[in-house]
Structures are given as structure tokens and as C-alpha cells.
Amino acid sequence: MSITSVASVFKGDFAIGSQITVRGWVRSRRDSKAGISFLAVYDGSCFDPIQGVVPNNLENYTNEVLKLTAGCSVVMTGEVVESPGKGQAFEMQVTKLEVVGFVEDPDTYPMAAKRHSIEYLRELAHLRPRTNIIGAVARVRNCLSQAIHRFYNEQGYIWVSTPLITASDTEGAGEMFRVSTLDLENLPRTDKGTVDYSEDFFGKESFLTVSGQLNAETYACALSKVYTFGPTFRAENSNTSRHLAEFWMVEPEVAFANLDDAAKLAEDMLKYCFKAVLEERRDDLEFFAQRVEKTAIERLEAFVSSDFAQIDYTDAIEILKACDKDFEYDVEWGIDLHSEHERYLAEEHFKAPVVVKNYPKDIKAFYMRLNDDGKTVAAMDVLAPGIGEIIGGAQREERLDVLDARLAEMELSQEDYWWYRDLRRYGTVPHAGFGLGFERLVSYVTGVSNIRDVIPFPRSPKSANF
């Protein structure tokens, strides 16, 4: 007797006539006049539930089987048989069924067998994994996570665990969550009346990280090729479908590399991940194509087969100015491109993924390498049809004097970045990397447009439930 997953049965791992046990939850029950019940049981291992054909001669048929409703947990034992119905090759002739847990009040069970709005499910994040859509998102998210680790491992990268608590603001934006154990009712004060953070747990003002990049650079400048993959935090008071206060970032960093190397790495990684999900999670993608985004599969296939276009920011501005599109935000040199501009370039002008390079220095971070023109930096954004920016990256400034000048320009303290400056003092080397917002990637693959629906427990302004 083998305890197995539903996915293994559908893969054909068990011959017709095999005795197996499947454990999971009831999605639906249908009773026939012939005294047979049909149970759809899922365990999360794949999109489709397996059908269990339950005869009325089981000893618990009347007092338990006929009381099963959506959400009840069961252990189902029986024989693998060919399914005469459409939609799946196998089903189970059940010889034993154990009810592990009933749903207390089926009439008030929030996840009863009916379709709910995605907004309703967001309020029940602890139960929404039981639905088709969130279960499919979770499997795709897992597939993409595994593909990312596999890609970098195959390329010889070392995964580095960067700290979640930091005293550095990577973006220089100041939108950070403060970490403190000070008593809010009795804050220590300096002679000037400001909060005395020397009395705090870390002896200085500390925050949740907005990026692992600066820390990753230190390891890239010793181990050559590294990447981080972990949570990051932004205290940005934006209540939109594109923003989260807590999200995951993938950040590779490569020594002896320039901006073109980073762009090639981004292209290779995205195509690798999309190929993986097309091969491994076809069942879930077919659901998304049917219910969420009809081009879900075709879009990924087109992406994988596309050559990335490359264009300078200055040329992109000229293209946007020359087009007859009525943009909400005016286009002029020096602006940070908005989503509408990004999507026009990727979807209408190039009709392919686009790498926009060499942005004005005044709209980019201090650590990005200053170009010879003195006006732009070696920064890039990867724009994807259907979503816009999906990756942002740069070649890092490896020249200490130029880095110091940029810090001064942006009124940042050399003292705060002493360790980062040391990398330029002791065997400096050109290096480059990028950041991929993982939830944005999951959103792109699934077609689920609100980023709060592609992370298990979303954190956003005024919302930290569960």
C-alpha cells in the first residue's frame, strides 16, 4: 500500500490496479441514485482533484461519507482505475475512507464550493490557499523559486544570506521601517532633544532592509558571483495593486562585469524561469489562461522566443515624444519612466522585452557607475510586455573618488558607508547586478494583476493581519 500524492497518480506513477492511499480535502461530493458517491479530493500537489468512487457498502457510508462537504479532510484508500469520464485518465475505486476532520458548519464555511471574488479571498488569507486560484499561484510561485535557485546554482553562483536589519539605506529614499526596542512612552533624549539611539538595542538607528545589494557586493568582491533571495521592506505609503510593504527580491551581483553582462544575465534568468514554469506547471497555467489572463501561456512562450531589444534612455525618450500616444505623464529628458511609457515601448513599439540603459544620474542611486558624459549612469531597466518594468539594475561605481563625489551630491555620509567604500580601497573591481521583485514576476507569469494576491500574507498600509 503506497501513500502518494494526487500528482503522482496523474503522472502515471502507479499502474492500473495498484492499491494506493491519498490524503487530502474534499472539493465536492456528488451522489448517484445507484448508491455511489463521487468525491473530488485534492491535496495541493497539482491543479486537478482526483475522483474517488465510494460504494455504499462501506461501513461508514451513511453516517460519514454522506455528510462530507467541501473542506472536510479525508484519507482515501483504494484501487487505481481508468476513468471513464472526461478530463482525467485515472480515478480511485475506494475500499476504505477515513474522515479526519469535518467542517463544523458547512453553511457558513467561507470556502464553500462556489467561486469567490479575489477581493473577498484577500480578507481570508488563512483559508484562501484552499481555492483553485490561490493554490495555483502557490505552486507557480514555488516553481519559480526553485527555478531561480537552480539557475544560479548551475551558473556557479553562491547564495548569500544578507541581513534583514541594517543601518544603511540602499536606495537613499528614506522609506524604511525603523527597528527599535526603546520605550515609546519614555524615549531617551540627547542634549539637543533628539531621540538618543545610542541607548537602543543596536546602539544606533536601525531599519528593516530595503535591499540586500550593498551586502551582496561585499561577497561578490570576494567570491565573484553571488545572489541573494529574501524578503525586503519598504515603508512606502502606497495602497496600490503594485506595492507591498514586505516583498521578496532576487539580487545577483557579479565581479568583473559591466552593464551589458548584467542585461544578458537578466535575459537568461527570465527565460530559464519561464521555460521551467511552462514545462512543470502547465496545468496551473491552463487554469490562468482560462480564468485570469487568456494569453498567459502564449505570452510566456513569446517571451522565451524573443530577442531582447536594447535602447538608451535618451533614444527611448525620443521615441515616446514622437509617438501619437496621449500619455497621462508628460515625456521629457530627465523623468523616471512611468508604467504607461514602459508598456508602450515593450508592447507597441518593440513588441518584445526591452532593456533601457543609461539613465540620468539625478533619478538614480548613488552607487550606480557614472558614465563618461557626466550626466548619465550605467543603469538599466528590463521592460516586459504586459507589465512594464520587471528588473532594475546597474553597473556599480568602483572608483572611490567618483563614489565619494556622488555621496556628497546626494548628501549622504561617507562615515555611514565606510565599509562600502572599503571595497573600492582594497582591490576594487568593476561589478554589476540587478534586482528582481519576485512578486512582480509571479504576477506576470500568472496574470494575477494585484500583487497582494501572489504572496501568501500581504503586508500593506493599515494591513498586517494573520
UniProtKB/Swiss-Prot annotation:
Q: Name which cysteines form disulfide bonds.
A: none
Coiled coil region boundaries = none
Q: What is its main location?
A: cytoplasm
Give this protein's Gene Ontology molecular function annotations: asparagine-tRNA ligase activity; ATP binding; nucleic acid binding
EC number(s) reported in the record: 6.1.1.22
Which subcellular locations apply to this protein? Cytoplasm
Keywords from UniProt, A to Z, are:
Aminoacyl-tRNA synthetase, ATP-binding, Cytoplasm, Ligase, Nucleotide-binding, Protein biosynthesis
Catalytic activity, as annotated:
tRNA(Asn) + L-asparagine + ATP = L-asparaginyl-tRNA(Asn) + AMP + diphosphate + H(+)
Q: Which SUPFAM superfamilies match?
A: Class II aaRS and biotin synthetases, Nucleic acid-binding proteins
Q: Does the keyword Iron apply?
A: no
InterPro entries in the record, alphabetically? Aa-tRNA-synt_II, aa-tRNA-synth_II, aa-tRNA-synth_II/BPL/LPL, Asn-tRNA-ligase, Asp/Asn-tRNA-synth_IIb, NA-bd_OB-fold, NA-bd_OB_tRNA
The cross-references to Pfam families, in alphabetical order and at most eight, read: tRNA-synt_2, tRNA_anti-codon
Q: Which GO terms describe its cellular component?
A: cytoplasm
EC category:
ligase
The Gene Ontology biological process annotation of the record reads: asparaginyl-tRNA aminoacylation
In which family does this protein belong, per the annotation? Belongs to the class-II aminoacyl-tRNA synthetase family.
Question: What does the subunit comment say?
Answer: Homodimer.
Protein's recorded name: Asparagine--tRNA ligase
Q: Recall the taxonomic lineage recorded for the source organism.
A: Bacteria, Pseudomonadati, Pseudomonadota, Gammaproteobacteria, Alteromonadales
